[in-house]
Amino acid sequence: MESYLNENFGDVKPKNSSDEALQRWRKLCWIVKNPKRRFRFTANLSKRSEAEAIRRSNQEKFRVAVLVSQAALQFINSLKLSSEYTLPEEVRKAGFEICPDELGSIVEGHDLKKLKIHGGTEGLTEKLSTSIASGISTSEDLLSVRKEIYGINQFTESPSRGFWLFVWEALQDTTLMILAACAFVSLIVGILMEGWPIGAHDGLGIVASILLVVFVTATSDYRQSLQFKDLDAEKKKIVVQVTRDKLRQKISIYDLLPGDVVHLGIGDQIPADGLFISGFSVLINESSLTGESEPVSVSVEHPFLLSGTKVQDGSCKMLVTTVGMRTQWGKLMATLSEGGDDETPLQVKLNGVATIIGKIGLFFAVITFAVLVQGLANQKRLDNSHWIWTADELMAMLEYFAVAVTIVVVAVPEGLPLAVTLSLAFAMKKMMNDKALVRNLAACETMGSATTICSDKTGTLTTNHMTVVKACICEQAKEVNGPDAAMKFASGIPESAVKLLLQSIFTNTGGEIVVGKGNKTEILGTPTETALLEFGLSLGGDFQEVRQASNVVKVEPFNSTKKRMGVVIELPERHFRAHCKGASEIVLDSCDKYINKDGEVVPLDEKSTSHLKNIIEEFASEALRTLCLAYFEIGDEFSLEAPIPSGGYTCIGIVGIKDPVRPGVKESVAICKSAGITVRMVTGDNLTTAKAIARECGILTDDGIAIEGPEFREKSDEELLKLIPKLQVMARSSPMDKHTLVRLLRTMFQEVVAVTGDGTNDAPALHEADIGLAMGISGTEVAKESADVIILDDNFSTIVTVAKWGRSVYINIQKFVQFQLTVNVVALIVNFLSACLTGNAPLTAVQLLWVNMIMDTLGALALATEPPQDDLMKRSPVGRKGNFISNVMWRNILGQSLYQLVIIWCLQTKGKTMFGLDGPDSDLTLNTLIFNIFVFCQVFNEISSREMEKIDVFKGILKNYVFVAVLTCTVVFQVIIIELLGTFADTTPLNLGQWLVSIILGFLGMPVAAALKMIPVGSH
């Protein structure tokens, strides 16, 4: 079976599957009882095609708009521009001077002419009653007016499905419809023959069973939909920095309004259409909106920023002009939201299993019906009544047909693929409580197969709460942890050096020191920037004073490829100076001078270089992150087109930043090792720092290899083949090094790789990995969008929790499949053999519907929602090549099926003698006993299925309230069916002895299951 599944249903990958692969497996699933329900959690490929068409249209539209705006720019200044634009009265009364349609046409149409008519960005700022310095007012009344005129920043979504819609979808089941038709005919014929109410019992029994199945199914599906709705709401929680009422603050992107001033940096997604106000080196990736991969430069000359695009480089301030469904992104997202998520490989595989078993079931159903009809025909031939059909015989034919249809109901395990969704929804909800947000359903199951985790250091293995604890300035290396130590340090070095140091810290930064609510000083920026700015303040520096004394004219933001950040500032008397900071060795290599202990600039000779490198090594060996700060005197002239100097710098000094290892990381790494998962650290930090942290975390062992990115890049494929299995630390790595490592692990070594990332440049590695894990706190929006799981607390221990839940999902589905296939096999064979040998089916349509509900909806609820056990992380991972239906499962399925078949067959052949049954009701009593024993076999088999290999199946059973509730409901309802609903279910009340025998024979399946688990089989 596994080879058939891999061949026909193996094209669908955990991520990035082609539409052709998604389409192909659907065509193979031709035995589907209820397409609406079966394919509810699969991608809507037609909606995706529609979204792609919108992208292509956008690409052409914006290309034309850019060409037109470029042509207009050549003569726009020479024209006397006038506008025929008429301001709507309601907009004027609200206090604004431009309407939303006019605003939208400016940015979407890249219309420089209209922008010029309205006075440029400054003119629009006034017309929107806002200010670049202060932003909009936060007064509730004013915000309400703004929302009323310009709309809110939300796109139209499909309305939530109500419970009754799920009931309607459950009723679309073809087999249930056929059974309903049978029930209707049975009602009519029965009432005509036997009158009301006796003649209606059979028909009403089937109707009641159908309604019960429908309502239980709808309730389960509705609960799942609510869980997914909660998860979708979590995915959409994105915040952005804005200025409102002169205060820099964070708000949800859905609260943005036209007139807001938004602060954007590398990796941010642009949350609305807007105009560039000011910024440096801004490159925008518009591929998500237009499909165009080439980044677009944005500046005062080309100021248009489109919602949904991403900041690839640089930083800027933006004026929001258009929000929500007025933007092209809003329209695209409204379409994409209906496209749905890709189905997971496990869902597809189980659709394959359902299809195979469905075909077998259909074959058995047809044969069973044919055998039953043949038996009736033979009887009529013996009676010589070929052409005379009584009402009883017609009812028998109808019952045979209903039994055949119900065999299909039981045989087509529609619940298999849906159990995956149920289990994933349950796991995802629980993982949210454990600080992990799953964006891609498949990641949940794939994480259970992970064999390697490539983890960042900063913020994942460490706390990301950084402080400067050591510094070497003017040849003096001292501890500077705390304001007192920092002030003492500052007093011991020349004032000129302190001034240069503060200028470097406060001007060459992506952070900012602002006054927040309640006049509290607040530092905004990355943890590294925050640590440096805090150090600057503790040295007695004044951020605003230093910033106002110079003018920043060019910025090259930090990125993980260059490993440095640079600015050019203009000082009084038109003198230009460049400041640079970054990875210590890299920045130091670009220096040829340094500041000595007297504050003088002197050449950086071999002795001084060696001294500084020793300081870097010393700091790094103490697990400190080291940064080098340097400056370069440019002179009186600097062109904005010119690059920031790359060499000839003067070293100001080295700082050592403490970033402590997170509590519990060492234990989590040990858990990974015991689970057969290799943890590798991939960091941009210094090799010595990386090794110190890796040893502290338990990642780097005595026989492990630590290497730098540049050296890794130089290795040949043959060398990498020997190196990678022992590689535990990669330092000074670029994002492409991480991408290469992930690719080689997946292709060369067939590993299932999980990788963490936080920066924009990590997107390729996150995309390449089997499971991309983005950091929720330090991660950029670009990284989060490329990831499959967002680690909300940036903690490595949470990654281990995700792996544990992933394994739990995989094993829970295996348990459910094992349980369901056992019921399938027994129900099919019992009815088929009985029909062939006795001419009767012991399990009626109503009884089979109840069995179907036990094994389908209730079974999935019980087994697919088992919480993970700690010993899950003591097993080896399944890996890339593991079979889903393992040898262990086949052993359990076949052994348990054989036991149940032997019991039921003995009852059918010897049951009357064994129980002393005679009289007119003996057949009914025997069939009731068979039905009762069959159900109790499934109840106890459900308990046995909690563990596929362990004998102790009761561990933690009382903690799983869902499991206990399902078992209790099953037993209670079974008693009601036997004792009270016999008229409808074709059963008769049993005496105490018969009940005890039913329970004992069902229970004996557990020792049988335990004995089976002692039979050794290969794991796959």
From Swiss-Prot:
<keyword id="KW-0472">Membrane</keyword>
<comment type="function">
    <text>This magnesium-dependent enzyme catalyzes the hydrolysis of ATP coupled with the translocation of calcium from the cytosol out of the cell or into organelles.</text>
</comment>
<dbReference type="Pfam" id="PF13246">
    <property type="entry name" value="Cation_ATPase"/>
</dbReference>
<feature type="topological domain" description="Stromal">
    <location>
        <begin position="865"/>
        <end position="884"/>
    </location>
</feature>
<comment type="similarity">
    <text>Belongs to the cation transport ATPase (P-type) (TC 3.A.3) family. Type IIB subfamily.</text>
</comment>
<keyword id="KW-1278">Translocase</keyword>
<dbReference type="InterPro" id="IPR001757">
    <property type="entry name" value="P_typ_ATPase"/>
</dbReference>
<feature type="transmembrane region" description="Helical">
    <location>
        <begin position="885"/>
        <end position="907"/>
    </location>
</feature>
<feature type="active site" description="4-aspartylphosphate intermediate">
    <location>
        <position position="456"/>
    </location>
</feature>
<keyword id="KW-0479">Metal-binding</keyword>
<dbReference type="InterPro" id="IPR004014">
    <property type="entry name" value="ATPase_P-typ_cation-transptr_N"/>
</dbReference>
<dbReference type="InterPro" id="IPR023299">
    <property type="entry name" value="ATPase_P-typ_cyto_dom_N"/>
</dbReference>
<keyword id="KW-1133">Transmembrane helix</keyword>
<feature type="binding site">
    <location>
        <position position="758"/>
    </location>
    <ligand>
        <name>Mg(2+)</name>
    </ligand>
</feature>
<dbReference type="InterPro" id="IPR044492">
    <property type="entry name" value="P_typ_ATPase_HD_dom"/>
</dbReference>
<dbReference type="GO" id="GO:0009706">
    <property type="term" value="C:chloroplast inner membrane"/>
</dbReference>
<keyword id="KW-0150">Chloroplast</keyword>
<feature type="transmembrane region" description="Helical">
    <location>
        <begin position="960"/>
        <end position="981"/>
    </location>
</feature>
<keyword id="KW-0109">Calcium transport</keyword>
<feature type="topological domain" description="Stromal">
    <location>
        <begin position="942"/>
        <end position="959"/>
    </location>
</feature>
<dbReference type="Pfam" id="PF00690">
    <property type="entry name" value="Cation_ATPase_N"/>
</dbReference>
<feature type="topological domain" description="Lumenal">
    <location>
        <begin position="184"/>
        <end position="201"/>
    </location>
</feature>
<feature type="transmembrane region" description="Helical">
    <location>
        <begin position="844"/>
        <end position="864"/>
    </location>
</feature>
<feature type="topological domain" description="Lumenal">
    <location>
        <begin position="833"/>
        <end position="843"/>
    </location>
</feature>
<dbReference type="GO" id="GO:0005262">
    <property type="term" value="F:calcium channel activity"/>
</dbReference>
<keyword id="KW-0106">Calcium</keyword>
<protein>
    <recommendedName>
        <fullName>Calcium-transporting ATPase 1</fullName>
        <ecNumber>7.2.2.10</ecNumber>
    </recommendedName>
</protein>
<feature type="topological domain" description="Stromal">
    <location>
        <begin position="223"/>
        <end position="350"/>
    </location>
</feature>
<dbReference type="InterPro" id="IPR006068">
    <property type="entry name" value="ATPase_P-typ_cation-transptr_C"/>
</dbReference>
<feature type="transmembrane region" description="Helical">
    <location>
        <begin position="920"/>
        <end position="941"/>
    </location>
</feature>
<dbReference type="Pfam" id="PF00689">
    <property type="entry name" value="Cation_ATPase_C"/>
</dbReference>
<feature type="topological domain" description="Lumenal">
    <location>
        <begin position="908"/>
        <end position="919"/>
    </location>
</feature>
<feature type="transmembrane region" description="Helical">
    <location>
        <begin position="202"/>
        <end position="222"/>
    </location>
</feature>
<dbReference type="InterPro" id="IPR008250">
    <property type="entry name" value="ATPase_P-typ_transduc_dom_A_sf"/>
</dbReference>
<dbReference type="Pfam" id="PF12515">
    <property type="entry name" value="CaATP_NAI"/>
</dbReference>
<keyword id="KW-0597">Phosphoprotein</keyword>
<feature type="topological domain" description="Stromal">
    <location>
        <begin position="1"/>
        <end position="162"/>
    </location>
</feature>
<keyword id="KW-0112">Calmodulin-binding</keyword>
<keyword id="KW-0934">Plastid</keyword>
<feature type="region of interest" description="Interaction with calmodulin">
    <location>
        <begin position="21"/>
        <end position="32"/>
    </location>
</feature>
<feature type="transmembrane region" description="Helical">
    <location>
        <begin position="163"/>
        <end position="183"/>
    </location>
</feature>
<feature type="topological domain" description="Lumenal">
    <location>
        <begin position="982"/>
        <end position="991"/>
    </location>
</feature>
